[in-house]
């Protein structure tokens, strides 16, 4: 079980539900969704999620503008999950503060691995374990 709060932002309802389901099946207990950049910023201010998975192409405030505003107010880790795969798009994501950039379509397992790696780097003091022979100690 993972109690980290993940916010998934995309204007496609089916994709939101699919990504939410992927994380719930993987043991994440708090997976929030937002269908616009504006809604995502509101959720981030109110709920303070541990990580955001953010689409680029959305009506109104796109993912790059959302990321730029999010970086102005927070250091929440962000993974861009988008169909925009041109080098310039990736560079824009990283220049605006994205922690990772993954193209659609994606492999669910790859998304999970990337998110888990980002969370480990962003919150290194949490979820630490020490192994002694057959015993495991949570620090």
Identify the role of each PLM range.
Residues 4-5, 117-139:
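Short, Lys/Arg-enriched segments at the junction into DNA-binding effector domains
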Residues 13-32:
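Two-component/phosphorelay signaling modules centered on CheY-like receiver
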Residues 33-51:
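Acidic, metal-coordinating helix/loop segments flanking the phosphotransfer/catalytic sites
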């Amino acid at each position: 079980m993972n109690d980290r709060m993940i916010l998934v932002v995309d204007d496609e309802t089916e994709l939101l539900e699919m990504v939410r389901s992927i994380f719930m099946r993987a043991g994440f207990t708090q997976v929030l969704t937002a269908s616009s950049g504006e809604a995502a910023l509101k959720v981030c201010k109110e709920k303070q999620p541990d990580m955001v998975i953010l689409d680029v192409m959305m009506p109104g405030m796109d993912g790059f503008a959302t990321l730029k505003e999010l970086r102005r107010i927070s250091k929440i880790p962000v993974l861009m999950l988008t169909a925009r795969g041109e080098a310039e798009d990736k560079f824009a994501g990283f220049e605006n503060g994205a922690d990772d950039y993954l193209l659609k379509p994606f492999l669910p397992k790859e998304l999970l691995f990337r998110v888990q790696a980002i969370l480990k780097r962003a919150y290194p003091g949490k979820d630490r374990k020490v192994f002694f022979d057959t015993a495991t100690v949570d620090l």
